Amino acid sequence: MDRKVRVVQYGTGKMSVYTMRYVYEKGAEIVGAFDVNPNVIGKDIGEVMGIEHKGVVVQDAKDARRVLEELKPDICIVTTMSLIADVEEPLMLCAELGINAITTCEEAFFPGNSNPILTHRLDEMARKNNCTITGSGYQDIYWGQLISSIAGSTHKITKIKGSSSYNVEDYGIALAKAHGAGLSLEDFDKEVASVDRMSDEDRLKIIERGEYTPSYMWNVNGWLAQKLGLTVISQSQKCVPQTHDTDLFSSTLNMNIKAGDATGMSAVVTTETKEEIVIESECIGKVYAEDEYDKNEWSIIGEPDTTIVVSRPCTVELTCASIVNRIPDVMNAEAGYVPTAQMPDLEYRNKPLNEYVK
């Protein structure tokens, strides 16, 4: 492509500060921005980023259709919510208008195994209008490509086991309570674990209705299976309490969590495949003890066994850089809803983004 890639930013919160700056620094340009927050609408995106004005004002998301029809951008970056149903509006709008889109929405990483109906609708609309929709972010490398690359150096695999942890203290009281922090193990079982205790048949019915709420790893396991050419025969999810052997004080909950009570939870997803490789991954959210920190740990078990650990990852920056570096792959991909498992491996971009677009 012999001109700059034209990008629209949908959602101008914390993530957009990085995605927009990275877009400019990779030789592309932001031509439009949208939000629903009245405190942001009307501001120049430079003000949002904390830099000089760029001459692009954040507009009300309700005007997105009209503005996108006028702007005709190459791609839209959507950085708003975590469930595919919550980003349906901007993604479907892009699909209808023939605009490529990439989102940080965690479920969008591989939504076909958690909301197949909506994924199919987005896929059909994008195919009809010759554009590509996908999801990317931190998991593209650290829960995905990193593991598939290690698999490439392994003779025989029997199991892939992964975990990623985060401190619920960093995300507010609603998330801490949703993770069962502060509950006795008995109450945790009643209020948290029992919600996801169902048969495979019942879970499948909920998925087929588009009403399932997956943990982040649910979609990651599906992505890994596709990337590695595995055939999924069953997948289950359970919530397991996390505990500590001494009392912990939670500033978010403003309470002392007794030793042995739940400090949070792990959502464990187990995938069995026809090829007899088991993928077991977990997302651990809990109140940290003083010596604990964010950690991403994956093991490939077989011949040989290999474990890789990423300590204290800069998740926000890595997420946003992955999104921006993926832009040429999205623009070069076939039309439809295309998971990044079906795209080339994510690469560092040392030239302007347009030079990678075919």
Where in the sequence are the language-model features?
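Conserved active-site and cofactor/substrate-binding residues in soluble primary-metabolism enzymes
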Residues: 10, 14, 18, 71, ...
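Rossmann-fold NAD(P)-binding glycine/threonine-rich loop
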Residues: 106-130
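N-terminal glycine-/serine-/threonine-rich beta1-alpha1-beta2 phosphate-ribose binding loop
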Residues: 1-96
